[in-house]
Amino acid sequence: MLHVSASKGMTEYFKNILDDVSNLYNLAEECRKNGYDVTDHVEIPLAKDMADRVEGIVGPKNVAERIRELVSEFGKEPAALEIAKEIVEGKFGEFGREVGAEQAVRTALAVITEGIVAAPLEGIAYVKIKKNSDNSEYLAIYFAGPIRSAGGTAQALAVLVGDYVRKNMGLDRFKPTEDEVERYGEEVDLYQSEVTTFQYQPKAEEIRVAVRNISVEITGEATDDVEVSGHRDLPRVETNQIRGGALLALVEGVLLKAPKILRHVDKLNIEGWNWLKELKSKKEEVIEELEEENDEYNYEDEEDLSQYEDYEVEAVTKFIGEVIAGRPVFSHPSKKGGFRLRYGRSRNTGFATDGFHPAIMYLVDDFMAVGTQLKTERPGKATCVVPVDSIEGPIVKLNDGSVLKIDTVEKAKQYTDEVQEILFLGDILVNYGDFLENNHTVLPSSWCTEWYEKILKSQNLEYTEEFIKNPGQKEAVNYAKITKTPLHPKYTYFWHDISKENISTLRSWVIGGKYNPSNDSWELNYDPEDEEISNAKRYLELIGCPHIVMEEKVEIFEYYPFLYSLGYDFDEKRDMIDNIDEKLQNTKNNMHFINTIAPFEIRRNAYIYVGARMGRPEKAAARKMKPPVNGLFPIGNAGALVRLINKAVDEGKTDEIEIANVKCSCGKVSLYRTCPFCGNSVEPTGPSRIKLPIKDYWYKTLENLKINKPGDVKCIKGMTSKDKIIEPLEKAILRAKNNIYVFKDGTTRFDCTDVPVTHFKPVEIHVPIEKLKSLGYLKDIHGNPLENEDQVLELKVQDVIVPESCMDYFLNVSGFIDDLLEKYYKKDRFYNVNTREDLVGHLIIGMAPHTSAGMVGRIIGYSNANVGYAHPYFHASKRRNCDGDEDAFFLLLDAFMNFSKRFLPDKRGGQMDAPLVLTTILDPKEVDGEVHNMDSMWEYPLEFYEKSLEGIAPKEIKKMMETIEDRLDKDSQYEGIGYTHETSKIDEGPPICAYKTLGSMMEKTSAQLAVAKKIRATDERDVAEKVIQSHFVPDLIGNLRAFSRQGVRCKCGAKYRRMPLKGVCRKCGSRLILTVSKGAVEKYMNVSQTMAEKYDASDYIKQRLEIIKSGIDSLFVNDKRKQVKIEDFFK
């Protein structure tokens, strides 16, 4: 029986996945029983839910059922505390006091993080019971760097759990000395200056208050080489180095998440945390209304002018504080002409991914491809670019002065080379759920067709769908006049972007024109030398009114609504306003003025412009270690720098390697559990250094595989795991044969950017309809039988659409697994695939780097975009949102057959990014809670748009909005999720981000600034200065410092912090090489100075670059020596 609520169809879907998982698991078990692998069983336990994952990752044994009971009864956080209490009480076995406390904290943290992230394993080093100066005992939690993967809230709750455990163990509170209190403050400052900045910069007094009041010691391992200089050698602090994990738990946990902790404290009735109320909570963004203009108004009509208030929001500049070279700024904060905020969700947006018109993706010189990350002004910190062509596209000015709306990709490609200026970037489609998740004020909506249609519906007016989408000019004007409704959004221009005086100037020029029947346009005389006409022409551009410039004439084709908006009756060819100067004087602002002279209501087109800059480019590439290798078979330095085992064999080289081994009864050294030379079962013992018989293993492996001449096979130098147990060489050779690479845990992976999709068309994923039917896709979203490739289907929650390149790579991986089955395990081939379509329906694992739990998925097709499409639930099951991060896919059978915990590095963080447990069925309740805020409506209500004008908190309107949270524990949690905006093609747009195709840094920065130059909402001089200050200068200074502190290395792999006295490698006698080259130090010097001059950077920046250059020259340039005579000194 399934443990989730689902319809009959979804139940059948899950049953098929479970059956396929079971079949693959059994096949892998049969293979492993042969004794050719590290263990005789599959090392990835299957988990049906969060409780199974927790028990599988951190234990203790038999805890899963109790977790289910507690979560069902109390909820996640209370259950975590109760399970911690029961562990220290000995209900799951007798532990020592410290061991029990550590187990309790780990298990509770695992419950809080849904048993997915690695933090409970790797983020907590250990827990100790220590003594205060008065000899009382207290609890100390030692945090490590990977605690970051838990997120701020979970980090804070880990401390809360520690306090709860302390109380239940009868321990006293932590009583810090003044030196210990001040030590935290010193470490926080040092961490931010030498390592990296925190999300939240706490004041010194906040740190003191927190440390004095938190009842457990937040401490940890040394994570960075930087040492404190003041509060050193403290008896209870084991290191003088920075404790990064402890600082994360304190600053980004307790201090940053103080409001959330207080909510949990109040809810759970935990005492001792009221001091948090004294700390200042983070400031929320609020809408600030501009003060009224100083003009004198005449309010004789006593009309309500509140609708004409000027709106401004406080610009959020944090996203643009750092600009990376080669990655363009598309819009400065809240700058006119930037991305216009529009509410809604398309089938490929939501969950931190925003929609953009595909035309703008081409017009910014291909710097926006599907999956490209943008750092955004609001509502969150970042988003992912995806195409939505049903929203407003960009408006551009061409070289000849014409202004066009670019509403198709074809137009964008046609006019790209002719664009002089991008006047308006188009819409950014953001769903309500992202505002709810970020607790960001719901800002005023732009004037859009969906809002307009809601108004018409509310008044029971008749209209057609075609009228809403694309009304004729006269039709729109007449409809507005007759029905007393606002003018259609299509003909509503950006009047608010120019002043009322500018509108008046524009009006005077426009009314002086005439109708041109041959072109069906309104024709204006245009003389660019005439200042007044030139200004009026600019105002025409700024309001976004399309027009063509031809032979000293300006032709306006949308003349009918445009003229009426300016108070000119086209039909009667007369000015409807007699006293324009009086109207100008007596109106409050631009929108009041335009509404006074127009015969209908004109809404404000845009309230909010959103700033954005490029973050990371999209990614779709095979996961490779550095350097890439085919297998986890160590050969030391025998393969030279290229690490080729073929080379070692051909040259007869070997090396001494620390490795698990045993001498077999046949007299040979066996590195495996089955001796490759005689077939006896043996058990390699703990690692020891031996001269590896590389040649013997090479030829024996080729004989076993019946391969004569394999290609190049790259191997590792040595194992970093605890037991140094290795992978059979056969696997490395077969991977090389199939041109694939191995990761640290024995799996073969493909990384790609996470992008959400809830619905798709068969044509988008290159899969025949009959194949989709066999996978359970029988009807489209309207309930019609699936018959053609353009129907829209709802994606099943564990199905994924991989990139085309991933499909090709997995063809190679499947070939490797089939070869492994046939040649090594002597089994029948399993996949037998020849085409991409053959892989459709096969199972994969999806996994994020910061986690230790995988999620089973099923391939249903591939796209042309370099991203991994999956249901938002699927991404959330990996504890990810979709703001530009990348995760991995790998074939399920590959993981079952080749993964081993015993390959994992024996160091902090070594167990991250490894499938220590595998979730088979996706339960929406047990995924990252962010996805629960995603809205699932087919349309937003009229009240939403009206409330948005008030700048309301998102929680205050939640009742009128349906989100995923409202569907949990119902059959509808998996099906029937809606979206508000259609898109023609989910992978429309440039195939690859321009950043990845450009060569040198000079090319990248030139392209970056060329984009900035043509975007109205961007200041290229400011971009150039920010690139120099935030990227080039820190890099130059850092590399200069690194050069002066560098060590040396040898080609044999030996590294020295300082040059040995002999001047050569002590290991092999070879010449030593510098680790930081001259080129690395000065690589950005020329491009920085060129940019500073070209874009007239400030004198401060130019002088700073000169100082850095003189520092570099002092290292690498000899001072010129001039021969002088003694009499020269007497001149």
Curated annotation (Swiss-Prot):
Per the record, what are the reactions this protein catalyses? DNA(n) + a 2'-deoxyribonucleoside 5'-triphosphate = DNA(n+1) + diphosphate; Exonucleolytic cleavage in the 3'- to 5'-direction to yield nucleoside 5'-phosphates
Give the E.C. number(s). 2.7.7.7, 3.1.11.1
Q: Name one GO biological process term.
A: DNA catabolic process
User: Which protein are we looking at?
Assistant: DNA polymerase II large subunit
Please describe the quaternary structure of this protein. Answer: Heterodimer of a large subunit and a small subunit.
| GO-annotated molecular function | DNA binding; DNA-directed DNA polymerase activity; single-stranded DNA 3'-5' DNA exonuclease activity
Species of the source: Methanococcus maripaludis (strain DSM 14266 / JCM 13030 / NBRC 101832 / S2 / LL)
Primary role? Possesses two activities: a DNA synthesis (polymerase) and an exonucleolytic activity that degrades single-stranded DNA in the 3'- to 5'-direction. Has a template-primer preference which is characteristic of a replicative DNA polymerase.
- What Pfam families does this protein's entry cite? PolC_DP2_cat (PF24846), PolC_DP2_central (PF24844), PolC_DP2_N (PF03833)
- Keyword check for DNA-binding, yes or no: yes
